[in-house]
């Protein structure tokens, strides 16, 4: 089980990413626009740099929905490998079987 503080920190980052997503997209569009003047671009770059670091989606980390474990995460299920294995063995995940060859 991950520390509660780490799980809460990640939730805080998710909220911040959602809050600034539209603003970041607009600024990135200006920066990538070839028709924009150099002054507009520099202004957009400086404004983008002034946004909080945690508003960047790159800083998000996928965590297990049950334990908060950051490694061994399966996106399809939203669980870490350990919990996924337990759930599959109990039959809680439909359509998944243990491999045998």
From Swiss-Prot:
Gene Ontology terms: biological process: translation
InterPro entries: Ribosomal_uS14, Ribosomal_uS14_bac/plastid, Ribosomal_uS14_CS
Keyword Lyase listed: no
Domain of life, source organism: Bacteria
Keyword rRNA-binding: yes
Function summary: Binds 16S rRNA, required for the assembly of 30S particles and may also be responsible for determining the conformation of the 16S rRNA at the A site.
Subunit structure: Part of the 30S ribosomal subunit. Contacts proteins S3 and S10.
Protein name (Swiss-Prot/TrEMBL): Small ribosomal subunit protein uS14
Upper classification of the organism: Bacteria, Pseudomonadati, Pseudomonadota, Gammaproteobacteria, Moraxellales
């Amino acid at each position: 089980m991950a520390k509660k503080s780490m799980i809460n920190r990640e939730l805080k980052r998710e909220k911040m990413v959602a809050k600034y997503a539209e603003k970041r997209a607009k600024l990135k569009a200006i920066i990538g626009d070839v028709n924009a003047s150099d002054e507009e671009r520099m202004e957009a770059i400086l404004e983008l740099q002034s946004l909080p670091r945690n508003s960047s989606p790159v800083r998000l980390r996928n965590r297990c929905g049950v334990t908060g474990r950051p490694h061994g995460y399966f996106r399809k299920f939203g669980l870490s490998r350990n919990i996924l294995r337990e759930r599959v063995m109990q039959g809680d995940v439909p359509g998944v079987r243990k491999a045998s060859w």
